Amino acid sequence: MPVKALFKPFYLGALELPTRVVMAPMTRSFSPGGVPNSKVIEYYRRRAAAGVGLIITEGTTVGHKASNGYPNVPHFYGEAALAGWKKVVDAVHAEGGKIVPQLWHVGSVRRIGTEPDASVPGYGPSEKLKDGQVVVHGMTKEDIQDVIAAFAQAAKDAQSIGMDGVEIHGAHGYLVDQFFWEGSNQRTDEYGGSLANRSRFAIELIQAVRAAVGEGFPIIFRFSQWKQQDYTARLVQTPQALGEFLQPLSDAGVDIFHCSTRRFWEPEFDGSELNLAGWTRKLTGKPTITVGSVGLDGEFLQFMVNTDKIAQPASLEKLLERLNNDEFDLVAVGRALLVDPDWAQKVRDGREQDILPFSREALMTLV
């Protein structure tokens, strides 16, 4: 099937993407002190030069004391980190690409001993999980407002250094998603209980980001059913419930939904072939990004279990068919782009035989 659908421009207000190929956010941990360096700049520049229309950066921590959970991940606060990101922006723009930061708070995933302040524990919606296990500092309402303010400031900073929008990380069992999920949200106030109440934190956060950046500055929201704490978890079981969950987020100011799945080809609900991005587009009318093992014959978790496994390039025929049918608008590519910065150009040129396979070793280097 012709690949031209991947390489058509995409327009959303003032945002113009040269192609439908999106670089998925992937934690890389190559920014000592939280500052993106020359290797990080070149890493992103190479993808833009080879035909990636939109780069969503690796997760970048907002300016809250408990936002970070891992060593050497980049910050999105402070003079040095923002100056580093400005260099990344300029390099990507010079190649004709667009770029947004993924704004991130890890929540209860954080552990005592983590930089930058080792004394700070993880923060979560409530100190106990559904099974009663005490895991974190349960957030007060003041804590909630502090985190919301940190996201709003990060978005404003992104706009000021020339980023083309922002993505809010609301997926995979990190803080925003911890509020969504009843397994981690045991609050009894207006931020807990029903899914509508558990969504209140995200809604207020999105509203604050929108107020900080004004109209016309794109806000992408990434969400998932699955959690790193439970890969079988599901926030909703039916299309109706999905629509009820997403509409308030859309109304709060989301422009594009990034629908995270482990395998893009899997139907989200019985009775339809639509995946999560397809249903989200149908229910909200907003553009969507699909993601999940694009371009490879094996999903990510297999490489955590079997370190010798190699994922070979896979056919894009089913992906292109869905894209041509307007099931979704944009396609996020993760590991295939991580290992091969020229992936998009090779696909465009019909050089599939030259695409590099993925192995776990690729995670250890920045190319």
Feature annotation, model-predicted:
Residues M1-V367:
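Flavin-dependent oxidoreductase catalytic cores
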